[in-house]
Amino acid sequence: MAELSEEALLSVLPTIRVPKAGDRVHKDECAFSFDTPESEGGLYICMNTFLGFGKQYVERHFNKTGQRVYLHLRRTRRPKEEDPATGTGDPPRKKPTRLAIGVEGGFDLSEEKFELDEDVKIVILPDYLEIARDGLGGLPDIVRDRVTSAVEALLSADSASRKQEVQAWDGEVRQVSKHAFSLKQLDNPARIPPCGWKCSKCDMRENLWLNLTDGSILCGRRYFDGSGGNNHAVEHYRETGYPLAVKLGTITPDGADVYSYDEDDMVLDPSLAEHLSHFGIDMLKMQKTDKTMTELEIDMNQRIGEWELIQESGVPLKPLFGPGYTGIRNLGNSCYLNSVVQVLFSIPDFQRKYVDKLEKIFQNAPTDPTQDFSTQVAKLGHGLLSGEYSKPVPESGDGERVPEQKEVQDGIAPRMFKALIGKGHPEFSTNRQQDAQEFFLHLINMVERNCRSSENPNEVFRFLVEEKIKCLATEKVKYTQRVDYIMQLPVPMDAALNKEELLEYEEKKRQAEEEKMALPELVRAQVPFSSCLEAYGAPEQVDDFWSTALQAKSVAVKTTRFASFPDYLVIQIKKFTFGLDWVPKKLDVSIEMPEELDISQLRGTGLQPGEEELPDIAPPLVTPDEPKGSLGFYGNEDEDSFCSPHFSSPTSPMLDESVIIQLVEMGFPMDACRKAVYYTGNSGAEAAMNWVMSHMDDPDFANPLILPGSSGPGSTSAAADPPPEDCVTTIVSMGFSRDQALKALRATNNSLERAVDWIFSHIDDLDAEAAMDISEGRSAADSISESVPVGPKVRDGPGKYQLFAFISHMGTSTMCGHYVCHIKKEGRWVIYNDQKVCASEKPPKDLGYIYFYQRVAS
């Protein structure tokens, strides 16, 4: 490279900017690749736009924008110097003290075993004229000061990825209890000694809780692995209703573990010192003698013994490197994302859409490619498939690699992709653990939105579901079709093959709990896959079905079949369910999934000769002056049996009052309960509860239900507030017509996010209306010119499949635990466990959560 002259620097001085507080500085990662300052060519940061580029892509940015001046960062690793106290360059990692990631005392994902030397230069394109950071002294003051201030500001600024990580996940953020300032404490309490405590109902001397109302000392809950207590403290709450308890042994002058049984969470008690003094406990003199709940949970998170089967931990695995075997770094509870994208980019359609067309996508990228969906997905696919980042961890300065690094690669860190895919989403924008199935559908939805007028790889998953409802009183039927991407397979636990062993285990477990002994070895239910398939296709009774033939309620049966078979069949095992107390739980079940699968028997037949359809008649409506009780004016848009699909009046038929009341009594908002019954088509309490649990974190969860063609609550008319033009433009840019954009916005009170969701869920109706417009006089050419969609495209073929991938979950809930995936490549199974990519020896095909089957060519 030639040396940078004063004249050259003066020529670009006006374009050099000093980053301000609101600027995003991308100095950790290339916008088009996963190159970093540690890559061989370093990273070039534009000193005007603050975008970062690897050596391969910096000229692309220069040619597109004309920006010439860049800050070149190059970092090289060297081993940490020996610690004088330990005599090693690898000092012991600090034990985490908080159940958190990326905060003081939490799990430190960035802790490395090496230090970095940094080389900083200013480079001017296209001739790559350069000057070192410390070589600016000979320049005129005005030039030196301007360049130096920009360089120092760039180096000291928080990078865009760092700002994203500042949203650190912290499992310890606790709220002040609603009982803290109004807690009732009984008179004349017993004095609590400073030590020597024992449960008043058993012999437990640890995991003890002091009830802050009556001073009872009782043991805590039993944990899922059999450790913990005997549940006496929570049983006492159920008997008395006394809500707050403090864990003995955790009381210090700084605080203690306080649990609210009423709020079902760890809480803060600002009046704790006062509450403890009621029992003669001086908080300032207490010392910690027991583990806090956080420490216990951290211990469980660090123990992976129960996960050995899925991670194949007990078997030496051969690490794999090269194209298609690239690991993905865990960005803090991002294993759900890692597993899903590994599977998607093993499918040829996604490779063709994003990787094969990489150059075209990059060429058409906007000025800021970090905010472009197609660019970031293409970048991710190339990073996974190119092999450029699938190399062993670099050797240290002495030429050796530590043993545990031999099977680990640097892999890629998809920070930009994660930030973009989660932007605006209440869950995926956080660093909390998520459900892989929900993320899969979210990603599918994002792909759908960005492929309106181009090749859509989602077609490999898309299929039509045929639902047949038969009124038992009249024998008349109704057929409907809907689009889906996942086959959700129920688990009939009563079909377990080892019922006797399960009953014996439950009896041994009960005895062990009574006698305070260790729990017996776990016995896992073994359910045949054929039983799951039978349960999926079995008729389902629908009570209180509104029969349009009778114009009255009746009993019906519903059967579900495939109207088409997709190229790739995605099967979700419904392991996560609810107990009788509506508490989420995970079924510990083993299902031997077949390598070869034939579901031809589930092909739908449509209306058969001799079958008579139910009349297409709207049910009676509730008028404003009729009593509505707790229901309001809400109905079901999907089933003609409940209401008309098109609303022209402000009223709609009632929903199942008993289900709504049942949900409200559980503490859920009335409007959310109405929506739950509405969107599940009066299918009963369980279906409505499942909807509630899966939508609790939606920003509009408790907002009133607004039906298409009706005004929102409190508004006079949707037309009174015309849709904003920028929202219309945004929807039109996604490939929809202006009429469709206006209709969607009016149906959702001009909410852009909800309008996009609405338009996708009503695409069939919109297409039908577009076709009607053509038949009423509009020319086909006019229709094509407005890019009217032609409806969801589905592929169909034989129902024979072969297993090619599955995602497994470890843990008791989708909100915690860990995900890995197994993919069959080049005739062998491969396990992808974040950065570790290895040949699989014993793929646990019976313990998966989501399975991916590929159609077998006939």
Curated annotation (Swiss-Prot):
Modified residues (Phosphoserine): S149, S156, S779, S783, S785
Sites where the protein binds substrate: W209, R221, R222, Y223, F224, Y259, Y261, D264
Listed GO CC annotations: cytoplasm; cytosol; lysosome; nucleus; presynapse
Protein modification: Ubiquitinated by SMURF1; leading to proteasomal degradation. SUMOylated at Lys-113; SUMOylation affects the interaction with Cav3.2 channels.
Outcome when changing M666E: Lower affinity for triubiquitin and tetraubiquitin, but no effect on affinity for diubiquitin. No effect on activity
Catalytic activity of the protein: Thiol-dependent hydrolysis of ester, thioester, amide, peptide and isopeptide bonds formed by the C-terminal Gly of ubiquitin (a 76-residue protein attached to proteins as an intracellular targeting signal)
Key words of the record: Acetylation, Cytoplasm, Disulfide bond, Hydrolase, Isopeptide bond, Metal-binding, Nucleus, Phosphoprotein, Protease, Repeat, Thiol protease, Ubl conjugation, Ubl conjugation pathway, Zinc, Zinc-finger
Domain USP: 326-856
Annotated localization: Cytoplasm; Cytoplasm, Stress granule; Nucleus
Record note on what altering C219A does: Decreased rate of activity
Record-annotated disulphide pairs: C195-C816
Known EC number: 3.4.19.12
Matching PANTHER family: UBIQUITIN CARBOXYL-TERMINAL HYDROLASE
Domain notes: The UBP-type zinc finger domain interacts selectively with an unmodified C-terminus of the proximal ubiquitin. Both UBA domains are involved in polyubiquitin recognition.
Miscellaneous comment text of the record: The UBP-type zinc finger domain crystallizes as a dimer linked by a disulfide bond between the Cys-195 residues of both molecules, but there is no evidence that the full-length USP5 exists as a dimer.
Primary role: Deubiquitinating enzyme that participates in a wide range of cellular processes by specifically cleaving isopeptide bonds between ubiquitin and substrate proteins or ubiquitin itself. Affects thereby important cellular signaling pathways such as NF-kappa-B, Wnt/beta-catenin, and cytokine production by regulating ubiquitin-dependent protein degradation. Participates in the activation of the Wnt signaling pathway by promoting FOXM1 deubiquitination and stabilization that induces the recruitment of beta-catenin to Wnt target gene promoter.
This protein's name: Ubiquitin carboxyl-terminal hydrolase 5
Naturally occurring in which organism (per UniProt): Homo sapiens (Human)
Gene that produces this protein: USP5
